[in-house]
Amino acid sequence: MILGIDHIGLATPEPLRTGAFLEALGLSPVDGGVADDYGVTCEFWRLPGQGPDIELVSPARPNSAIEGRLAGQGPGLYHVAFVVDDVEAELRRLRGSGLSPVDASPCRGARPGMTVAFMYVPRPAAFLVELVAYQESAERRV
């Protein structure tokens, strides 16, 4: 079951410059990490006391999952991440609704206790969705 919006991902090759823009908008960095399965560095930003977060996604290594996106479309809106109670169950349910899985199975996310999987919403919407679940010991974002 989808519980809410966790974050909105922005693809950027320059997280420092993009972070300065977010700072000017009043956001502050709250946490971050590396999602090794995707080869990306993630920084999460938030308005004081408010969510959802804004995630800056940048390459952590050559041939990362984000490099093709940056090369083909440039920086910008990358995905919308929804918090779910069970990533595998949502993958199955959404496949049946016509979404195309990017990940065959869930992967570790950039935050502690975070499990993620990506799906593509076909046209006419045509955007990337991230399903996010947190272990019970991790802070729930919704």
Spans of features found by a protein language model:
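Long, hydrophobic N-terminal alpha-helical segment
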Residues: M1-V40, S64
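Short, structured motif recognition centered on aromatic/hydrophobic residues
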Residues: I5-T12, L22, W45, D53-V57, ...
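Vicinal oxygen chelate
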Residues: T12-A20, A24-L25, G32-V34, T41-R46, P52-I54, R61, R69-V142
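Short connector loops at helix/strand junctions that flank enzyme active sites
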Residues: V40, G49-G51, G72-L77
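Feature marks short, surface-exposed loop/turn motifs that line or immediately flank catalytic pockets
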Residues: A60-N63, Q135
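Short, surface-exposed linear segments at secondary-structure transitions and domain or protein termini
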Residues: N63-G68, E139-V142
